[in-house]
Swiss-Prot record:
Protein biosynthesis as UniProt keyword: yes
The species this protein was found in: Culex quinquefasciatus (Southern house mosquito)
Residue spans of biased composition, Acidic residues class: 161-183, 207-232
High-level lineage: Eukaryota, Metazoa, Ecdysozoa, Arthropoda, Hexapoda
SUPFAM superfamilies reported for this sequence: Winged helix' DNA-binding domain
Subunit structure: Component of the eukaryotic translation initiation factor 3 (eIF-3) complex.
One Gene Ontology MF term: translation initiation factor activity
Protein name (database record): Eukaryotic translation initiation factor 3 subunit C
Biased composition (Basic residues): 257-272
């Protein structure tokens, strides 16, 4: 074979001549990497495999819980159920059917997570569609699956801090792995051979990069092998005769100790994290140095205590300040000042700083403070205000500078503001109430603190009145009004009924005194506006309708309220709602409807009264806006019953709308008095099958349908019954009086509706018959019909001798009215079709000369002519009607004269 086809090697090992046949060295078919030579094959049991699969799935579940990926969490839970089903034979065999503790822990954590996410309704709204759907499916599947683990979960809940099986397994694995690593690092000293393959293994252990050598093994490789063999020989002899076992045991002990230390540090870190979570994110300031108290032999006086106080308070607001430690220092400083008897001024200064430090303890202003801090805050403020009231020579004011403070001689001057502290206290109390569940005992317990808060405000009122600052007096008066205006005082009604002496003071008298002072002395519009609104609310709450109405009309608040801040607008809405209820109790149906129509027309009375947030679409309200609106919500005990408001509004609309609809049944230009009530009525009429009423709205709609036919008894039964009494009418103070007023108005409006509806049927109708039909006195029926005739609502005349109502046929009949409506609608349709046809023609640029202009002028002239004809016809109809009325009047006069002549 030629040298060209042979392709010999160019390396130094090719030293043969050209005549000799060239042998090409073949590469081995299978090469083993160094890793494959070193790694030992580990045989694991079925239990280890199954438990490892379960632990991996549990880790993924915990990761998905952190990021709230519900769809992935659902799929991982399904994987967990399948993996547990696979591991069940192993569990029954190895664990005697007892479920491992790490699985129970994972199920308990998953249950807590699902319940937490499900209870967070606001957070659920922000979930995506896929995540919310997956959350519902996960909750259903989990509740079904967890029934088999009820007993195990109960045992786990009793002692959740015990160690898991998974942790033990991991510890064993770590120990085994560490032992394997030690065995791999230190070669065994038992079987040391001097063969070539062992030498190659030692070489591989020394240098892993040498495994990538070329395939050509020649003389150089042999020489390398011989040299490495000699080195390995010496190394193996050294290792063979070296003492290892004792040292290795010592190393193992040291490593085990190190592992224990690392585990202890990890456990301590975990505990620290749990404590940090319990403290709700409080930072521990280990870096900041503790300010040292006084030396043992130091002479403690006022200046030294004040300097130390300033030193402690200098760290206020800084990043690494330990707030808890700061409060402890201040209390210790107070104890020292009391022990040394440094005076009331120093004690007041220290107590005021303690109050400020407690306020600073909560860094987030939007969140309420803890209950333990709240109780301490109440104690400190009560002690401070008692100290200020007992020592009249102490002046605590924000106008005093730090340089001008005086602690040695009276009058003592201290920089600070007691009013600001009490306002902050009141705000914190409101935040605590908002945070509690309103239907729990916790809310009742917190509400009991209002007595303490109002007592503190009353004491601060005395202190501020003693100082004589009018602006601060207005501010503290308004705080007192805020706790007083929404509370009902039964002594007001007792005093009105002369059941109490006239000299007794009631809440109305107190509100009058406080509000009059603010009206006269306040220099800001906001305080005066809030005082007027609270005054109106309190008057309306105690049925002082005329005083409340006059205040609203004189203040012109409805014109300027749009420029006020949101809390003032919320107070305005609450005031108008309560004013509407007061008007309804007094029987002023129109006024009640006008007060409530603005609230109810929007369909969002809950939001306008700050009594909760209505769920909206995702883009309508951002998270920041929702957070701000939550801060503006009113506490639950100040809420106005929304169902009561809606019922009063719908009943008022029914009493106004039904007679109006009957009077203008065929009027094409009829306007709606209440759009909301009209929609409720129309939606009920569109239903093919209407059952008995159940909700409050259905009761009002059924009553409206009965009133349209003049059936006042059915209408009254729908409005006033056992179910409606429980839901609505029993919530009023004098419920029986309200029910009597309702029955009277239903009878009167049903009579008006009956006359409007059936006036074209009767020629005359007897007044006693109407009085008997509607259970009204004859005088009331007579006055109602007279008003209708005077207001030109009913074309009729009263015949007093015969006590009859003579009805005139001046109105068109039903057929005539319908034909007139049809003619109007057909005319409008023709006009609109002509306009559409002209727009579609598009011949605007093909007219000759002034053709279009002439036609427009002709149309305008025709319209004017039609309008004049319509006016003439209307005048003629009015003249004919007047002539008919005069003729009827003359006939009645003639009949009366004839009747008198016959009687004589």
């Amino acid at each position: 074979m030629s040298r060209f086809f042979a392709g010999g090697s160019e390396s130094d090992s090719d030293s043969s001549s050209d005549s000799e046949p060239i042998q090409r060295q073949t590469a081995p078919q299978f090469t083993f990497s160094d890793e494959e030579e070193d790694v030992k094959r580990v045989v694991r049991s079925t239990k280890e495999k199954r438990y490892e699969d379960l632990s991996n799935i549990i880790k993924s579940i915990r990761n998905y819980k952190k990021i709230k990926d519900m769809s992935s969490l659902l799929s991982s839970f399904e994987d967990l159920t399948r993996a547990y089903a696979k591991a069940l034979p192993v569990i029954t065999k190895e664990e005697n059917g007892v479920c491992p503790r790490f699985i129970i822990r994972a199920l308990a954590e998953l249950e807590d997570f699902i319940n937490e996410v499900w209870d967070d309704r606001e957070g659920r709204k922000n979930l995506s569609k896929n995540n919310s759907k997956s959350l519902g499916a996960l909750r259903q599947k989990f509740r079904k699956y967890i029934k088999d683990f009820d007993s195990d979960l109960k045992k786990f809940r009793e002692s959740p801090d015990a160690a898991d099986d998974e942790d033990e397994e991991e510890e064993k694995k770590e120990e085994e792995e560490s032992d394997d690593e030690e065995a791999a690092v230190v070669p065994a000293a038992k079987a040391v051979s001097f063969k070539k393959d062992t030498v190659e293994k030692v070489k591989v252990e020394k240098d892993d990069d040498d495994s990538d050598d070329s395939i050509d093994w020649g003389q150089d490789s042999d020489s390398d092998e011989s040299s490495s063999e000699e080195e390995a020989y010496g190394a193996n002899i050294r290792e063979r005769f070296l003492k290892r076992p004792e040292k290795e045991d010592g190393d193992d002990g040291e490593k085990k100790k190190e592992k224990k230390k690392t585990k202890e540090t990890k456990d301590s870190r975990k505990k620290k994290r749990v404590e940090d979570d319990d403290d709700e994110g409080w930072e521990s300031s280990a870096t900041s140095e503790k300010p040292k108290m006084f030396a043992k032999d130091a002479e403690i006086d006022v200046a030294l205590v004040v300097n130390k106080l300033n030193e402690v308070m200098a760290a206020r607001g800084k990043k690494r300040t330990d707030r808890k430690l700061q409060i402890e220092f201040l209390r210790e400083l107070r104890a020292i000042s009391e022990e040394k008897k440094l005076g009331a001024a120093v004690a007041a200064k220290i107590r005021f700083n303690i109050v400020s430090a407690i306020f600073d303890y909560n860094p987030k202003v939007s969140e309420p403070m803890k209950l333990e801090h709240w109780s301490k805050l109440l104690e400190e403020i009560q002690a401070l205000i008692k100290l200020l009231l007992a020592n009249e020579d102490i002046v605590l004011s924000e106008n005093i500078l730090d340089e001008n403070e005086e602690y040695d001689t009276a009058p003592y001057k201290i920089r600070g503001c007691m009013l600001t502290a009490v306002e902050r206290l009141d705000d914190e109390f409101t935040k605590l109430l908002k945070e509690c569940d309103p239907h729990s005992n916790e809310y009742v317990d917190r509400l009991k603190d209002e007595v303490t808060v109002t007592n503190v405000i009353e004491q601060v009122v005395q202190y501020v009145e003693r100082l004589g600052n009018e602006m601060e007096t207005c501010r503290i008066y308004l705080r007192k009004i805020d706790h007083l205006y929404y509370k009902f005082d039964p002594n007001v009604l007792k005093k009105r009924k002369a059941q109490l002496p006239a000299s007794s003071l009631t809440s109305v008298d107190e509100m009058e005194r406080l509000c009059r002072f603010i009206y006269a002395k306040d220099q800001t519009d906001r305080l005066r506006t809030r005082a007027i609104l609270s005054h109106i609310f309190h008057h309306a709450l105690h049925d002082n309708w005329f005083q409340a109405r006059d205040l609203v009309l004189m203040s012109h608040l409805q014109e300027t309220i749009h420029h006020s801040d949101p809390p003032t607008q919320i107070l305005y809405n609450r005031t108008m709602a309560n004013l509407g209820l007061c008007a309804f109790r007094h029987g002023n149906i129109k006024d009640a409807h006008q007060c409530l129509v603005d609230l109810m027309m929007t369909g969002k009375p809950k939001e306008l009264l700050a009594q909760g947030l209505v769920p909206q679409r995702q883009n309508e309200r951002s998270l920041e806006q929702e957070k701000v609106e939550k801060q503006r919500q009113m506490p639950f005990h100040m809420h106005i019953n929304l169902e009561l408001l809606e019922c009063v509004y719908l009943v008022s609309a029914m009493l106004l709308e039904i007679p109006y609809m009957a009077a203008h049944e065929f009027d094409a230009r009829r306007r709606m008095i209440s759009k909301t009530f009209y929609q409720q009525l129309r939606s009920s009429e569109r239903q093919s099958l209407v059952g008995p009423p159940e909700s409050m709205r259905e009761h009002v709609v059924a009553a409206a349908k009965a009133m349209r036919h003049g059936d006042w008894q059915a209408c009254s039964n729908f409005i006033v019954n056992k179910k409606m009494n429980v839901k609505v009418w029993d919530l009023f103070y004098e419920a029986d009086r309200v029910r009597e007023m309702l029955a009277k108005f239903i009878k009167e409006e049903a009579l008006r509706t009956y006359l409007f509806t059936y006036s074209n049927v009767y020629a005359s109708i007897s007044v006693p018959y109407l009085a008997e039909m509607f259970d009204l006195p004859k005088s009331k029926v007579h006055s109602l019909i007279s008003k209708m005739i005077i207001n030109e609502e009913l074309m009729a005349s009263l015949d007093d001798p015969t006590e009859t109502v003579v009805l005139h046929r001046s109105e068109p009949s039903r057929l005539q009215a319908l034909s007139m409506q049809l003619a109007d609608k057909v005319t409008n349709l023709v006009d609109s079709n002509e306009r559409v046809f002209e727009m579609k023609q598009g011949n605007f640029f093909q007219r000759g000369g002034n053709q279009g202009y002439n036609r427009d002028r002709q149309n305008y002239r025709n319209q004017n002519q039609n309008r004049e004809n319509w006016n003439n016809n209307r005048r003629q109809d009015r003249g004919n009607r007047n002539r008919n009325q005069n003729r009827d009047r003359e006939q009645r006069e003639q009949h009366r004269v004839e009747f008198e002549e016959k009687a004589e």
